[in-house]
Amino acid sequence: MSGLESSLHHASEELPGDVQTTFRRRSIYESSEEEEGSSLSFPANSLAGSLTASDDDGLEEKRHIEYNLPPDGGYGWLVVACSFLLEFFAEGPISAFGVFQEYYVNERFKGHTSNATISLVGVLNGSCMAILGVVSGKLCERYGYRIVPMCGIILLSLGYLLASFASEPWHLLLTQGVLCGVGTALTFMPALVVPAQWFDRRRGLATGIVNMGIGVGGIVWTQFNHMLIRKISVAWTLRLTSVVVLVACTLSLMLIKTHQVTAAPRKVGWQALNDRRLVLFMCGSFFTGVSSLVPFYYLPGYARDIGVSEGGGALIASMANAASLTGRLVATAVSDYFGPIVILLCAYFLTSTSILLVWTTTHGFAGTMAFGIVFGLGYGATFTQTSALIAKLFGVDALPVFVGLYYTLAGVGYLFGPPVAGVILEKTKSWGSPYLALKLYTGVPMVVACIAIILVKLSTKKRLAA
């Protein structure tokens, strides 16, 4: 049974007890007078559900729902390519914020700000994007996947433009932080949801390719920002980013079209929170958010403090992003074979062990580079599986709401993660190993997230066995 058919049968379990469901492939709606034994040929690209129920008068009524199975290719691949570009230009710069942070703290606002304060800029960007995920999903459901993201692209571009004129740290909090974060929140939903509508058997591959846009973007934007800040100043770097984001994201969005899976999509209500798997999965997203951005924000500064050159620090950050891309590639290639839960568990194992066993025991360039690579591999694989796993566990109709909820809770984690790490770093500077507490603070939440996903897998096995 395919993933979509499993989702349909899962949805049928939520119908009233007096409703029996049967699912079979057909080309058109059948009339209610047609007998069950009619001989028809059904093409492979449509699936219909026949619902039989008894009303109060004891009369039998048939209701029919037609499901258009995803084509698993065709125009869907163009949707994947454009979604990749949307992720690259809208979310890629978030992974590259460490370069801006180092410049703001050590040059532009030197002596007038701290790591903890400036890290709030990147945190507000990432957390606003994520926390507003549910709102973005609901808005896209109501107004479509064209109008809402276009508003987001305009806000995102405007945020970078206004940030270029910032003369105080709090100006950056409002522009590069909040405004860019809100813009990204409204922009990224089509890239996460729409490709999954076009694929069933290859859904893991398709969504994985899309999510690689962040990893590729992190690599390119890190080097791009580092080079341009030195050549044309941070202000003109931000202005150029504003123009590039506006043009590239708009062109990509114009080619992203939705594929309606059902004639009447199932509405997802808050009663879904009664599902233990959903609660555990969302808890995992929160703790992932707490940990995941800290290394990207603090690796350049950490490298400088242990004697690595400025260029070496940027290289470590770039290699971490390159490893993130590799992790996304590997996870994407094997996702449909091993399944998203197994891939997610492997990703959490890599991130946890890299922080607690590698980063905590190294104090040189080579060891830090090794940590960045191993952590990047695990981190990259983590976020490739979100859409595929939600579709597998809860159905395609749940994607807008549950993907939004996932990123909302991850955003709350983002909001706490790097700023608290900055405070910890400031308080432990007098220690013999000032970064040790920060490393432990980064590693423990990732272990908790790993445990949550293990429990999701066990709960899924128990549910299937029941």
Go through each PLM region and give its residues:
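Extracytoplasmic gate region of multi-pass secondary transporters
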Residues: F89-Y104, T222, D275-V342, S387, ...
